[in-house]
Curated annotation (Swiss-Prot):
Function: May modulate neuronal adhesion and neurite growth during development by binding to neural cell adhesion molecules (NG-CAM and N-CAM). Chondroitin sulfate proteoglycan; binds to hyaluronic acid.
Entry PTM: O-glycosylated; contains chondroitin sulfate.
Organism whose genome encodes this protein: Mus musculus
Domain EGF-like residues, every copy: 960-996, 998-1034
Region (Disordered) residue spans: 363-391, 406-442, 472-540, 574-630, 1228-1268
Family, similarity comment: Belongs to the aggrecan/versican proteoglycan family.
Domain annotation Ig-like V-type: ranges: 37-157
PANTHER family referenced in this protein's UniProt entry, alphabetically: AGGRECAN/VERSICAN PROTEOGLYCAN, NEUROCAN CORE PROTEIN
Glycosylated residues, chain numbering: 121, 339, 380, 410, 742, 978, 1175
InterPro entries: C-type_lectin-like (IPR001304), C-type_lectin-like/link_sf (IPR016186), C-type_lectin_CS (IPR018378), CTDL_fold (IPR016187), EGF-like_Ca-bd_dom (IPR001881), EGF-like_dom (IPR000742), EGF-type_Asp/Asn_hydroxyl_site (IPR000152), EGF_Ca-bd_CS (IPR018097)
Bias-annotated ranges (Low complexity): 575-585, 618-630
Top-level lineage group: Eukaryota
UniProt-recorded name of the protein: Neurocan core protein
Length: 1268
């Protein structure tokens, strides 16, 4: 390559480099053309605690240019708020030319610390922070035509709350106050925290400790009893530093939540211990008071009281609404006593608020302790096989929902709820397949809900019956669909939106025969379930087993109370001590062998007069009647649903005792004689069993035909004890038959009491045909007296002395897609008691999307029962606690032993006026809430899609229970009831479902006509405006002149003729008034209602620009300007204010020479004629009435000189000022007159001279009472 080529190549390369450099310079010039550049921060929101200082960053850069040296950047900070769906910027400060102007409301709280030394640093320093400071802030920098901005988000954390000890108000020393805050996940608040909360509107008239050992409280609205050291001014009151041993409340400060607070609202409410257990099952703990306040601060809103870790019951309200504790947002507290002290009793039932930390940390005040609550573990098929249930010691109860109004269930069916009583556990074998419960605590109560199963034998889980296992059972659990807890919409507008945890429904495949255990009290039914059956070949159609067994006493305790000795069972039926026995039925061909079961019956306390009785053998133990149904066509297993009611006790009428009985030989196993009635006609009862064993004499319930009815005998239902042991066999036809040849009756004393129970519901699908019903209409019941307590002649027996009764449920059976071809029944045995008890009931069903028509009819002849319902919230959350007592209606004298035949008639049903409503039952059988009398429950299921209804029909003379009987409304509230639902009308100053919340009486503005309300301890007082009186300022004592309209103590008149502003004001003054002033939104609305044109008002800034004043010299308390007004738009000035009619009367400043209508305003209190003054007269025309603030002037008569002030004013009370003017003749004229008459020397007596020296009495002295 030649030298020329190299040179040319070098020139080409140089040219390319210059070209690139030129392009780069062009790009740099373009980049630097913009002289202002914002350095935006992208670090996320700025977080700071309450009452602290925070710096909101804002940085920008300036590129110096000769053309813009004179352009100085303007910095503006605003807060972005959303109002009416649109963003609005509230100005904070503006900085330019080394001058910083701070907007009103931010003065003393904001600054630019780096300005003006560092003009490019516009960081805003804000503090002490308030909770309302949270939000979005805009930093805007303007230089010439360039505009840059940045947004910064501020989050203020922490909340101040007042804490009161559980025992009383003002009960904490300084050390105890610090500890109370620590247990509430907070610290004791500092004075700056309380001041910041006050500036945000915190108002609480309770003195509390602060961190500097001072005692203070914040008051935004002064009222009697809350003045403190600031009189009637708002502010934080202070008692100064106090002795640490003095007692006050405390103000706590919670800084960070560090987790989530969630509401737990199960279908039935929880005790305090149950709430702890419920939270622990969800991997959380009960929330503390501070955590709930922080959650409320972050937006939690739930109108449902719930337990907290300190034992208090509170709930957070963001949006105030009716029946949620008052008109202001906040965390409400439920107090135990009317004086707003005390936490609810731990046994009371509420919902719960749980806290789950983001990182597992120990929570203050809620340590991990074994639960002793009322909630049992729920068996779930999702868990590992062989899961053991380990309940804590002590009996646990489940309270059924208090169905006092229709329930709206959302979600699917609810999982079973388990309760247990601790007893020795035994591990039993189980049939392979599916999860297995390795051990089950004895006396455990669970609710089974039936579901289709592929197993050969249906378990008690196919029946919606409350059952209680008396011994550990080895059970096979078949997997069932996961169910969710339903949520209810009840009183108080409460709607639960969350769903409970998914739990599994257990199904017990092979219940074994166990000795029964006592399990029922008055209105507290916990029947024992004990069955003995051998399973048929699983290839056959499934069997449905329904067993309701006679109860047997346990260790003499029901719940936490012991039974009286007079209610113990006879040793002739049950031994006080039964050793562990082993019962294994003989298997049938093709049947699976039932597992062996070992059981032990605890000792029963003996009566002092009772002789020792031998322990009976295994054959003497009470067994059960097994109700079996077969399906010959191999149809799948349909659910069996049943509901039971609590037992009720009454006396038989005297005429129902028939002593015509024939004794029969004793059975070797029976220690007592028995009889068989001669006139009893026993028909076969369809019970699916062919051979029955009678280990001792029993009584079997059977239909009885009655040929007469005594006038005293009402229609009642009683039943007999069943002591049969049945074994299953495949049989032909849907129903088996029971041979009554072995049926005998136990002896019954003539004054025996009869214990009845509400009839149950039994739904037994399983037949291929449709339609038809079967009802066991008449049953018998007997019981035996205790030995040693024979009935002496003449003695009386009351229902309280009944020792044992066999109670039957009378089902009306409807088959789902099948016909009922025989009646069925099963018996239970219960013990009456007057002890406080809780009615436990849960009902479940696996019916899918069916509508069930249920008709309930009450039998006659029931005694009056008194029910005292405990206090509580009426929402159907799962509890109904009642204390029942029975009035002894009549007693029967002692007679020899006799059997019992009861005449029966058809139950006469009459409508009770109960509401009838449409019920849609997606998958849950709704528990029935009836009265205290006997009821027969008929269930008719026509098809899976037929709509049904609830209708309650009553017969007899008993009145339904009145929920307002004991007036659950507190503080003088009035209870109103509608059936079983009640509501409270609260007196002034109280709110809440039961009027338990004491609110400010003045919140609802009780004072009328503009009166000022002042809240007091037990009421309020009204300070009335002039011309009003009465306790509520409801009395109008002064009126207005004709053509004027009165409003809140003033008179107003609208003048439609147009005048300039000055002329309008002059005309109003001629009428003893002024152009109207406006001091409240109510007054503005009243004035704006006069006309539909723009009108003058008395506001003006004619004296000082931008200093607006009213012409009546009242203060500027209220403003209602149009947007961007006042603006003083015209160069000549806009000094007068007009109400713009088409913009709802908003104000605008305009020139005063406009001709517009106007409104005059004057007072209602007027003064009479001015007082007369001697030697003086009024200037102008004398009037009959003068307006308040009107002035008059006196002038002296001719020849008299004026001394002192000549004007007086009409005061607000309608009286004139006392005149000060004095009119006196000059002394010179007297001397001249004396000198002129001197030659005559007409001397007068000295006495007359003294008389003339006295000044004459003036007229105004006579009217002394008219002056101030």
């Amino acid at each position: 390559m030649g030298a020329g080529s190299v040179w040319a190549s070098g020139l080409l390369l140089l040219w390319l480099l210059l070209l690139v450099a030129g392009d780069q310079d062009t790009q740099d010039t373009t980049a630097t053309e913009k002289g202002l550049r914002m350095l935006k921060s992208g670090s996320g929101p700025v977080r700071a605690a309450l009452a602290e200082l925070v710096a909101l960053p804002c940085f920008f850069t300036l590129q110096p240019r000769l053309s813009s040296l004179r352009d100085i950047p303007r910095i503006k900070w605003t807060k972005v708020q959303t109002a009416s769906g649109q963003r609005q910027d509230l100005p904070i400060l503006v900085a330019k030319d080394n001058v910083v102007r701070v907007a009103k409301g931010w003065q003393g709280r904001v600054s630019l610390p780096a300005y003006p030394r560092h003009r490019a640093n516009a960081t805003l320093l804000l503090g002490p922070l308030r909770a309302s400071d949270s939000g979005l802030y805009r930093c805007q920098v303007v230089k010439g035509i360039e505009d840059e901005q940045d947004l910064v988000t501020l989050e203020v954390t922490g909340v101040v709350f007042h804490y009161r000890a559980a025992r009383d108000r003002y009960a904490l020393t300084f050390a105890e106050a610090q500890e109370a805050c620590r247990l509430s996940s907070a610290t004791i608040a500092a004075p700056r925290h309380l001041q910041a909360a006050f500036e945000d509107g915190f108002d609480n008239c309770d003195a509390g400790w602060l961190s500097d050992r001072t005692v203070r409280y914040p008051i935004t609205q002064s009222r009697p009893g809350c003045y403190g050291d600031r009189s009637s001014l708002p502010g934080v009151r202070s008692y100064g530093r106090r002795d640490p041993q003095e007692l006050y409340d405390v103000y706590c400060f919670a800084r960070e939540l560090g987790g989530e607070v969630f509401y737990v609202g199960p279908a039935r409410r929880l005790t305090l211990a149950g709430a702890r257990a419920q939270c622990q099952r969800q991997g959380a703990a009960l929330a503390s008071v501070g955590q709930l306040h922080l959650a409320w601060h972050e937006g939690l809103d739930q109108c449902d009281p719930g337990w907290l870790a300190d034992g208090s019951v509170r709930y957070p309200i963001q949006t105030p609404r009716r029946r949620c504790g008052g008109p202001a947002p906040g965390v409400r507290t439920v107090y135990r006593f009317a004086n707003r002290t005390g936490f609810p009793a731990p046994g009371a039932r509420f919902d719960a608020y749980c806290f789950r930390a983001h990182h597992h940390t120990a929570q203050h005040g809620d340590s991990e302790i074994p639960s002793s609550g009322d909630e049992g573990e729920i068996v779930s098929a999702e868990g590992p096989p062989g899961r053991e249930l380990k309940p804590s010691l002590g009996e646990q109860e489940v309270i059924a929902p208090d169905f006092q109004e229709p329930l709206m269930s959302s979600g699917e069916g609810e999982p079973p709820d388990l309760t247990w009583t601790q007893a020795p556990e035994e591990t039993l074998g189980s049939t392979p397949g599916g999860p297995t419960l390795a051990s089950w605590p004895s006396s455990e109560k669970w609710l089974f809900t039936g579901a289709p199963s592929s197993m050969g034998v249906s378990s008690p889980s196919d029946m919606g019956v409350d059952m209680e296992a008396t011994t550990p059972l080895g059970t096979q659990v078949a997997p069932t669909p996961t169910m969710r807890r339903g949520r209810f919409k009840g009183l108080n507008g409460r709607h639960f939106q969350q769903q409970g945890p998914e739990d599994q429904l257990p199904e017990v495949a092979e219940p074994s025969a166990q000795p029964p255990t006592l399990g029922a009290t008055a209105n507290h039914m916990r029947p024992s379930a004990a069955t003995e059956a051998s399973e048929s070949d699983q290839s056959h159609s499934p069997w449905a087993i329904l067993t309701n067994e006679v109860d047997e006493p346990g260790a003499g305790s029901l719940g936490s109370r012991s039974l009286p000795e007079s209610l113990m069972w006879s040793p002739s039926l049950i031994s006080p001590s039964v050793p562990s026995t082993e019962s294994t039925p003989s298997p049938k061909p093709g049947a699976a062998e039932a597992p062996s079961v070992k059981s032990a019956i605890p000792h029963l306390p003996r009566l002092p007069s009772e002789p020792p009785a031998p322990s009976p053998g295994p054959s003497e133990a009470l067994s059960a009647v097994s109700l079996q149904a077969s399906s010959a066509d191999g149809s799948p297993d349909f659910p069996i649903v049943a509901m039971l009611r609590a037992p009720k006790l009454w006396l038989l009428p005297r005429s129902t005792l028939v002593p015509n009985m024939t004794p029969v030989p004793l059975s070797p196993a029976s220690p007592l004689p028995s009889w068989v009635p001669e006139e009893q006609a026993v028909r076969p009862v369809s019970l699916g069993a062919e051979d029955l064993e009678t280990p001792f004499q029993t009584t079997i319930a059977a239909p009885v035909e009655a040929s007469h009815r005594s006038p005293d005998a009402d229609s009642i239902e009683i039943e007999g004890t069943s002591s049969m042991r049945a074994t299953k066999h495949p049989i032909s036809g849907p129903w088996a038959s029971l041979d009554s040849s072995n049926v005998t009756m136990n002896p019954v004393p003539s004054d025996a009491g009869i214990l009845g129970t509400e009839s149950g519901v039994l739904d037994l699908p399983g037949s291929p045909t449709s339609g038809g019903q079967a009802t066991v209409e008449k049953v018998l019941a007997t019981w035996l007296p205790l030995p040693g307590q024979g009935l002496d002649p003449g003695s009386q027996s009351t229902p309280m002395e009944a020792h044992g009764v066999a109670v039957s449920m009378e089902p009306t059976v409807a088959l789902e897609g099948g016909a009922t071809e025989g009646p069925m029944e099963a018996t239970r045995e219960v013990v009456p008691s007057t002890a406080d008890a809780t009615w436990e009931s849960e009902s479940r069903s696996a019916i899918s999307s069916t509508h069930i028509a249920v008709t309930m009819a009450r039998a006659q002849g029931m005694p009056t029962l008194t029910s005292t319902s405990s206090e509580g919230h009426p929402e159907p959350k799962g509890q109904m606690v009642a204390q029942e007592s029975l009035e002894p209606l009549n007693t029967l004298p002692s007679h020899p032993w006799s059997s019992l035949v009861v005449p029966m008639d058809e139950v006469a049903s009459v409508s009770s006026g109960e509401p009838t409503g449409l019920w849609d039952i997606p998958s849950t059988l709704i528990p029935v809430s009836l009265g205290l009398d006997e009821s027969v429950l008929n269930v008719v299921a026509e098809s899976p899609s037929v709509e049904g209804f609830w209708e309650e029909v009553a017969s007899g003379q008993e009145d339904p229970t009145d929920p307002c009987e004991n007036n659950p409304c507190l503080h003088g509230g009035t209870c109103h009831t509608n059936g079983t639902v009640y509501g409270c009308s609260c007196d002034q100053g109280y709110a809440g479902e039961n009027c338990e919340i004491d609110i400010d009486d003045c919140l609802c503005s009780p004072c009328e006509n503009g009166g000022t309300c002042i809240d007091e301890v037990n009421g309020f007082i009204c300070l009335c405006l002039p011309s009003y009186g009465g306790s509520l300022c409801e009395k109008d004592t002064e009126g207005c002149d004709r053509g004027w309209h009165k409003f809140q103590g003033h008179c107003y008149r609208y003048f439609a003729h147009r005048r300039a502003w000055e002329d309008a004001e002059r005309d109003c003054r001629r009428r003893a008034g002024h152009l109207t002033s406006v001091h409240s939104p109510e007054e503005h609305k009243f004035i704006n209602s006069f006309g539909h044109e723009n009108s003058w008002i008395g506001l003006n800034d004619r004296t000082v620009e931008r200093d607006f004043q009213w012409t009546d010299n009242t203060g500027l308390q209220y403003e209602n300007w149009r947007e961007k007004q006042p603006d003083n738009f015209f160069a000549g000035g806009e000094d007068c204010v007009v109400m713009v009619a088409h913009e709802s009367g908003r104000w605008n400043d305009v020139p005063c020479n406009y001709n517009l209508p106007y409104v005059c305003k004057k007072g209602t209190v007027l003064c009479g004629p001015p007082p007369a003054v001697e030697n003086a007269s009024l200037v102008g025309v004398r009037k009959i009435k003068y307006n308040v603030h009107a002035t008059v002037r006196y002038q002296c008569d001719e020849g008299f000189s004026q001394h002192r002030v000549a004007t007086i004013r009409c005061r607000n009370n309608g009286k004139w000022d006392r005149p000060q003017i004095m009119c006196i003749k000059p002394r010179r004229s007297h001397r001249m007159r004396r000198h002129h008459h001197h030659p005559h020397r007409h001397h007068k007596p000295r006495k007359e001279h003294r008389k003339h020296k006295r000044h004459p009495a003036e007229d105004w002295e006579k009217d002394e009472g008219d002056f101030c």
